């Protein structure tokens, strides 16, 4: 398939914010792609491979500007001026290409296959001379492309394709192109266990629907973890669970999935990032204490004091992440214990369709506790007094609260799902909300007075999982330290976009639109009906949405993707629960 055709489809996608229209455009594109489908699906995502493989192109804005200068004969200063005016390197490359560059007499045929393979080459070049080789490969794409093609190729390289489609929309496009809607839930389940859209696309195109219907966990391939809903009283939880639940501590750590196969171990975060290199102690200790052919476990890695057993806050784990140097020292400074609360796979057999009590029993039989690996503390009870005592003990021992888990026969492991099989409970409703919210930055307002020259406030949104959009819920201006405030323009600078991102639903107009990427943990006083914010618009009250009053920043959540943010439905449930508590008091 010619990449010029792909660029035309990308242009059409940029012109709409309607999800159904985006899905139809994608379906049409996928049907035309033929053998290029798998590569094309990755390119639509702005990637070359699934995230968990960690492939990076490694061509910075500065190197692209140098390449544009070399190919066009224009100075880097001139190109930087164009970049400043347009605010987008893809559009800059388009303008440079339009204004004339020296092209070869015999141009390469710019197919999807050719573009993809050139990008793979760019990602693979390392070591001495790699910068020149990467630049030459980009120039090769530039001189063989038309203006529109190089615009999108450059955006893919810089990680700023931003077509307004999330993985769920791409899945819908694939289903419309190659399958039937009746299989949609099963295909989504397959994707949650095997989060590689190229793999899903290939199987759908080849008619291998049974491969996807039978999909389950695969050692060394990360899965989307199961998540919990929330309620604000033990009584509500008992009623929701049908008085048939277990209760576990909710640890304040880093969600960790550990995969073991034939002596090899991989560790992944909640966001599917491989973090094996950050936890050499977990790897070494697992091999020392356990002997399996294969297994996959789900748990929480928590920093602790080995002398006292005291658990430390989550933020201390982050000191290890991304460190290549001084890791041995950090491992000594911040020892880790992994609290295991689920098992998905053992010795060649998937366990995800077993009820939770059976999976827990398998854990207890096969994982003997030691200093480095412990099972999540648990009780099985329907006595409200006992459950509350267990909750209070969890707080005393440094946890966030407890998680109720259904003991019913339907209590399977639902990858990627947030449902009522697991319900978290953090603390009683008092003067403010019983739980924090994870919200996405979608806009910024310029500061005044002491905050002049930086951002004064941020526009935050929740995630509407049904519509695949981000709906505004509050304007955040408190909880920042001076250091955080000065860092915000740097953190968000390359996320600033000229117009409202396609997936953002907002009636407010910030000074700067921010592409949804940064997640912040926020606490507030209460959720109120709002004519300004779009969260749950027209659901509670006609012409109004829901807003968080008096929001304040707790901490950034760099372990979460935008789609992991608090959902619209969760905020609706929190509003209803809050209203019920107020009416009782």
From Swiss-Prot:
Its Enzyme Commission number(s) read 6.5.1.1
Tell me yes or no: is Transcription among this UniProt entry's keywords.
no
Mind listing the GO molecular function terms for this protein? ATP binding; DNA binding; DNA ligase (ATP) activity; metal ion binding
| Cited InterPro entries | ATP-dep_DNA_ligase, DNA_ligae_ATP-dep_bac/arc, DNA_ligase_ATP-dep, DNA_ligase_ATP-dep_C, DNA_ligase_ATP-dep_cent, DNA_ligase_ATP-dep_N, DNA_ligase_N_sf, NA-bd_OB-fold
What domain of life is recorded for the organism? Archaea
Entry binding sites for ATP = 248, 255, 270, 300, 341, 418, 424
Q: Which residues does UniProt mark as catalytic?
A: 250
Gene Ontology terms describing biological process: cell division; DNA biosynthetic process; DNA recombination; DNA repair; lagging strand elongation
* Catalyzed reaction equations: ATP + (deoxyribonucleotide)n-3'-hydroxyl + 5'-phospho-(deoxyribonucleotide)m = (deoxyribonucleotide)n+m + AMP + diphosphate
Provide the alphabetized UniProt keywords: ATP-binding, Cell cycle, Cell division, DNA damage, DNA recombination, DNA repair, DNA replication, Ligase, Magnesium, Metal-binding, Nucleotide-binding
Pfam families found in the cross-reference section: DNA_ligase_A_C, DNA_ligase_A_M, DNA_ligase_A_N
| Cofactors required | Mg(2+)
Family per similarity comment: Belongs to the ATP-dependent DNA ligase family.
Say what the protein does: DNA ligase that seals nicks in double-stranded DNA during DNA replication, DNA recombination and DNA repair.
- According to UniProt, the name of this protein is DNA ligase
- Organism equals Picrophilus torridus (strain ATCC 700027 / DSM 9790 / JCM 10055 / NBRC 100828 / KAW 2/3)
Q: State which gene encodes it.
A: lig
């Amino acid at each position: 398939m010619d990449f010029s055709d792909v660029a035309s489809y990308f242009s059409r996608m940029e012109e709409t914010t309607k999800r159904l229209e985006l899905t139809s455009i994608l379906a049409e594109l996928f049907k035309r792609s033929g053998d290029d489908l798998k590569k094309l699906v990755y390119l639509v995502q702005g990637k070359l491979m699934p995230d968990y493989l960690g492939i990076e192109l490694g061509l910075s804005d500065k190197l692209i500007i140098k390449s544009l200068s070399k190919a066009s004969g224009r100075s880097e200063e001139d190109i930087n001026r164009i970049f400043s005016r347009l605010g987008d390197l893809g559009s800059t490359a388009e303008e440079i290409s339009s204004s004339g560059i020296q092209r070869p007499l015999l141009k390469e045929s710019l197919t999807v296959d050719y573009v993809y393979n050139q990008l793979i080459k760019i990602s693979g070049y390392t070591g001495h001379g790699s910068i020149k080789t990467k630049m030459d490969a980009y120039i090769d794409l530039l001189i063989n492309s038309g203006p529109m093609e190089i615009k999108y190729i450059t955006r893919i390289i810089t990680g700023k394709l931003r077509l307004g489609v999330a993985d769920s929309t791409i899945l819908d496009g694939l289903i419309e192109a190659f399958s039937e809607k009746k299989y949609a839930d099963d295909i989504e389940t397959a994707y949650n266990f095997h989060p590689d859209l190229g793999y899903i696309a290939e199987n759908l195109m080849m008619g291998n629907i049974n491969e996807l219907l039978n999909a389950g966990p695969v050692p060394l391939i990360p899965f989307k973890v199961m998540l919990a809903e929330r309620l604000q009283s033990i009584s509500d939880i008992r009623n929701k669970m049908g008085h048939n639940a277990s209760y576990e501590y909710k640890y304040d750590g880093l969600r960790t999935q550990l995969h073991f196969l034939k002596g090899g171990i991989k560790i992944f975060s909640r966001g599917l990032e491989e973090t094996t290199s950050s936890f050499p102690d977990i790897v070494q200790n697992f091999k020392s204490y356990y002997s399996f052919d294969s297994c996959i476990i789900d748990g929480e890695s928590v920093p602790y004091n080995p002398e006292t057993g005291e658990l430390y806050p989550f933020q201390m784990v982050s000191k290890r992440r991304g460190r290549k140097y001084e890791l041995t020292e950090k491992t000594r400074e911040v020892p880790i214990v992994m609290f295991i609360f689920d098992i998905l796979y053992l010795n060649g057999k998937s366990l995800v369709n077993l009820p939770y009590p059976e999976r827990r029993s398998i854990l207890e039989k096969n994982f003997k506790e030691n200093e480095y690996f412990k099972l999540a503390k648990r009780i099985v009870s329907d006595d409200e007094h006992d459950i509350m005592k267990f909750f209070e003990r969890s707080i005393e021992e440094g946890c966030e609260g407890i998680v109720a888990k259904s003991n019913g026969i339907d209590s399977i492991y639902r990858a990627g799902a947030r449902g009522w099989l697991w319900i978290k409970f953090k603390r009683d409703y008092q003067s403010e909300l019983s739980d924090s919210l994870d919200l996405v930055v979608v806009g910024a307002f310029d500061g005044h007075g002491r905050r002049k020259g930086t951002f004064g406030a941020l526009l935050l949104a929740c995630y509407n999982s049904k519509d695949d959009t981000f709906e505004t819920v509050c304007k955040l201006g408190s909880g920042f330290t001076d250091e955080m405030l000065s860092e915000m323009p740097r953190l968000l600078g390359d996320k600033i976009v000229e117009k409202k991102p396609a997936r953002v639903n907002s009636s407010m107009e910030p000074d700067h639109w921010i592409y949804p990427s940064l997640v912040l943990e926020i606490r507030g006083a209460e959720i109120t009906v709002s004519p300004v914010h779009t969260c749950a618009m027209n659901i509670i009250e006609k012409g109004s949405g829901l807003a968080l009053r008096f929001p304040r920043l707790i901490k950034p959540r760099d372990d979460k993707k935008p789609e992991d943010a608090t959902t619209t439905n969760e905020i609706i449930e929190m509003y209803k629960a809050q209203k019920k508590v107020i009416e009782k008091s």
